[in-house]
């Protein structure tokens, strides 16, 4: 297939000199087969793939997101079973090519995910959060449970799904599946380390571990505290899911890889095409390959420069990149 097929279970060095991989998030499956993205690792959700009749053959590296945030945000539960997801993964790997890694059917732990938010809006509205009250067995007319108890349930389901998928997937796909640590606050993240250990999983020996429930945090200092604490306990192989890119200067040194689709949101909010040749073609560049490639290229260029500066703490601050 190309780079992904030969990537093995190690962090490849195709993107930066020190081996940090920055995956470009995209909602366009056909980009996998686009030669323009051969050298750009892509991160794509199963929700964008699973209803297709045919799949594109990837020309470069890619990784699979389970789409868990959207699933639980919209429905308060998973709408597919682990068995169905395992079958989908096998299909993707066969037709697209072997992914660098596979995200499990984890359960995010942000308070909005747990308790719901803006439920008067349409389910498809970005501000709508269904809440997991029903999944947690809480009666609709009764008081909800404390955050710590709800997080514990989400974490228990996250660990259980990782164990289940590891058994359902054939090798080497089961080795590409990554465990994910979830939590609402730092003590929760530390607690799930023990939950994995109790299940016989030593996260420090895995080739990659996902860091979840960080994409909507407003305070990058809190994320930095969580990442640093996990790294101090031996997790030096983390992938940051949908990381808040303007905080990577605080915690990026502890991440082996990360993904972001911030380019698309940035272009959507811009409200008009970025490039002259796009005027009259589309109203903005939220779906534009050229905009995505330019953003990713700027990220990598700044990342490399930042790594060369001894005083630089981590990957880079992407505020300037997203404004470029």
Q: Model-predicted segments: where are they?
A:
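Non-catalytic, usually N-terminal nucleic-acid engagement modules in DNA/RNA processing proteins
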Residues: 1-164, 315-324
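Alpha/beta catalytic cores of nucleotide-metabolism and tRNA/nucleoside-modifying enzymes
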Residues: 1-35, 67, 167, 198, ...
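Low-complexity, flexible helical/coil segments
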Residues: 56-57, 74-83, 97-104, 215-220, ...
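Generic detector of well-ordered alpha-helical segments enriched in charged/polar residues
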Residues: 86, 90, 178, 190, ...
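Eukaryote-skewed repeat-based solenoidal scaffolds used as protein-protein interaction platforms
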Residues: 90-258
